[in-house]
């Protein structure tokens, strides 16, 4: 594509990996899962050379002991890339795509590998069986770059009152959102359960989903032996699920590097725009509990930069740790809450691998947009308690 500026950032490869062996000790460690996902991304691009030529290897922080996994991966692929390790936050993957795109555009990077993995499911089950999955030892080392900034998101007064986890906050956001719409409790529970049933149907068709068991709105809504009430109105089937083994990877590079590696133009996906934003860190300091000024500003700005309106966006994947996160984002961006708002099936069913879910959503979106050439896709990302946000619009 000689008409494209050589410094144009393009997403050329997306790979996902999932494992659920009958014997958990047969599972591979997260580092090996990352390698599998990166190789799948390179194969998706049709160019293993991208792994050899990478200038940056960025890893989304996970629940594992590696201090600089990017260096271990760099050594396996035999490249001399600069390594990066992110801070915590579900906003991280989209934020890294935004950062990579800017650096590529500015000539500060050529080929950026973005990857993350979690092996919580196998590790837990191996431990219950008195076994241990061996992890690669890494001498204490530091990445070339720490990506992002850790922020304190719980005020001491909030902690004193037991507000320390997402499940303490998001049900309150849900009730506040219901009240803002004037819904009764029962109307609201019915509507949210019906929305989550749609997410479940999408997940059942996604080969990389962790949970692919069909659930009706009634089954999602009502507590039961396998679906306990976690925080009203949320049952277990409305909560993010991180008890899983999943990995995902993206390869973002310059148009020039894509051509040099022999990546066919039909694999290219263009980041049309990307934005980041943040709400007030402490929930107790916010003006209300049913809105997000940062999503409104950063989300709409992403659309403005891409030159699209909500009605122009064909495919959407909103961060879906809990239903309130989806509804608040959809409302602030004027997308509406009645359309399909997931491509994966969401963090309950497709899976919520801690900080790395959005790597999966972008990877899934890549396949959707290639199948629907010329269409526009939106991915949103959320970290904390509707605190840290990132947005990306993509098209072929």
Which ranges hold each PLM region?
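Conserved "HGTGT" condensation-loop signature of ketosynthase/thiolase-family condensing enzymes
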Residues: 1-85, 102-109, 116-244, 248-250, ...
């Amino acid at each position: 594509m000689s008409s494209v500026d050589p410094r144009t950032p393009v997403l050329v490869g997306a790979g996902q990996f999932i494992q659920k062996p009958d014997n958990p000790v047969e599972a591979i460690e997260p580092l090996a899962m990352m390698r599998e996902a990166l190789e799948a991304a390179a194969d998706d691009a049709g160019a293993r050379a991208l792994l050899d030529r990478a200038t940056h290897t960025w890893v989304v922080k996970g629940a594992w002991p590696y201090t600089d996994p990017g260096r271990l991966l760099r050594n396996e692929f035999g490249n001399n890339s600069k390594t990066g390790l992110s801070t915590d936050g579900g906003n991280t993957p989209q934020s890294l795509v935004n950062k990579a795109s800017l650096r590529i555009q500015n000539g500060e990077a050529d080929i950026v590998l973005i990857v993350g993995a979690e092996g919580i499911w196998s590790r837990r089950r191996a431990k219950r069986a008195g076994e241990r999955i061996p992890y690669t030892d890494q001498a204490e080392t530091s990445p070339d770059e720490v990506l992002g900034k850790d922020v304190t998101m719980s005020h001491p007064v909030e902690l004193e009152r037991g507000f320390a986890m997402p499940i303490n906050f998001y049900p309150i956001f849900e009730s506040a959102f219901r009240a803002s719409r004037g819904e009764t409790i029962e109307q609201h529970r019915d509507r949210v359960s019906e929305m989550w049933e749609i997410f479940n149907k999408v997940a059942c068709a996604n080969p990389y989903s962790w949970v692919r068991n069909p659930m009706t709105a009634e089954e999602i809504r009502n507590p039961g032996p396998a679906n306990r009430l976690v925080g009203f109105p949320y049952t277990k089937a409305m909560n993010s699920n991180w008890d899983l083994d999943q990995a995902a990877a993206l390869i973002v590079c310059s148009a020039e590097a894509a051509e040099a590696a022999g990546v066919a133009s039909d694999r290219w996906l263009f980041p049309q725009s990307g934005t980041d934003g943040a709400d007030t860190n402490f929930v107790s300091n916010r003006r209300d509990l049913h809105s997000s000024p940062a999503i409104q500003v950063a989300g709409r700005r992403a659309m403005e930069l891409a030159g699209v309106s909500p009605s122009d966006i064909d495919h959407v994947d909103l961060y879906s740790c809990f239903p309130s996160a989806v509804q608040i984002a959809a409302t602030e961006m004027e997308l509406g809450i009645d359309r399909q708002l997931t491509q994966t099936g969401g963090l309950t069913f497709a899976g919520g691998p801690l900080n790395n879910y959005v790597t999966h959503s972008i990877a899934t979106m890549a396949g959707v947009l290639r199948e629907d050439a010329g269409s526009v896709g939106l991915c949103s990302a959320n970290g904390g308690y509707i605190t840290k946000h990132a947005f990306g619009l993509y098209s072929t």
